[in-house]
Amino acid sequence: MSSAAHLSPKPFGRLLTAMVTPFDSDGKVDYAIAGRLARYLVDEGSDGIVVCGTTGESPTLSWSEQHQLLETVKSSVGKAVKVLAGTGSNSTAEAIEATVKAAELGADGALVVVPYYNKPPQEGLEIHFRSIANAAPDLPLMLYNIPGRTGSSIHPATVKRLMNCPNIISYKAASGTTSEVTDLRMQCGSQLAVYSGDDGLLLPMMSVGAVGVVSVASHIVGSRIKAMIDAYSTGQVNIALAYHEQLQPLFRALFATTNPIPVKAALEAIGWQVGSPRRPLSPLKKQMKEDLIDIIKSLRQI
């Protein structure tokens, strides 16, 4: 980790927050809190916000709810940061429709996940992403690889073939390995901006060429994650390492069970009424919540 000179361009900044979706006591989307939360995330250092991704519970949101969330967040933050919409689906036609709609609503980009459950082969993945890119040619796209949730993975060689789509410019790496970043850089060079999809792997991934992170923990410690990124990117590696080590207990606690269950509990603990996750997700267990709160309290004393 001796140098940051090799980092690729960063089209959406370095710190993006995968924002939770707030629900009220009746389980309905609380758009007012969503707007306030988005502004808070900007104040805490986020360069961009991703709405309706994994952390935003997209599987249990209707398309109309997703559209209104995008409009709410975009209106709330204005041009201060980039706002990306999660538009992925395991139906190519549906993903195209969602991506085109996001562009119409003013999104600055779209996060498009590898299709889940139906497990297409690499040829199918190439056709899927190329079709989406061609349907919304003016909207920058971030491919999203998270095989632990989707059941399949896009190969770096497939990504390389997609690089002739001008609007496929970035990639969220959430396979859990730094080698994913290395393999992508070997295939695509610096043309593709790779973001870590795991807070705990942010610094290791930056050391091999990632430009930043799509973060969950930035809901709680955004300014510290931003400081870690800034320290590394300016060659202050020891300072970055100190942040990396200091924040590991929180990073681990936020993924001790299915995301976004812990981060919603963490937000409640610091005063944000974001509600429980929608079913079939369930609230955080009592002991895990107590452990998480202890970690947050200890970080606030540092």
From Swiss-Prot:
Residues the record lists as binding pyruvate: 55, 214
Annotated site location: Part of a proton relay during catalysis: 54, 117
Example of a GO cellular component annotation carried by this entry: cytosol
Gene3D superfamilies: Aldolase class I
Recorded metabolic or biological pathway in which this protein acts: Amino-acid biosynthesis; L-lysine biosynthesis via DAP pathway; (S)-tetrahydrodipicolinate from L-aspartate: step 3/4
Molecular function in Gene Ontology: 4-hydroxy-tetrahydrodipicolinate synthase activity
Keyword set includes Iron: no
Compartment(s): Cytoplasm
Key word Lyase present: yes
Annotated active site: 144 (proton donor/acceptor), 172 (schiff-base intermediate with substrate)
Role according to the record: Catalyzes the condensation of (S)-aspartate-beta-semialdehyde [(S)-ASA] and pyruvate to 4-hydroxy-tetrahydrodipicolinate (HTPA).
Assembly and binders: Homotetramer; dimer of dimers.
Stated family: Belongs to the DapA family.
The protein, known as: 4-hydroxy-tetrahydrodipicolinate synthase
Taxonomic classification: Bacteria, Bacillati, Cyanobacteriota, Cyanophyceae, Synechococcales
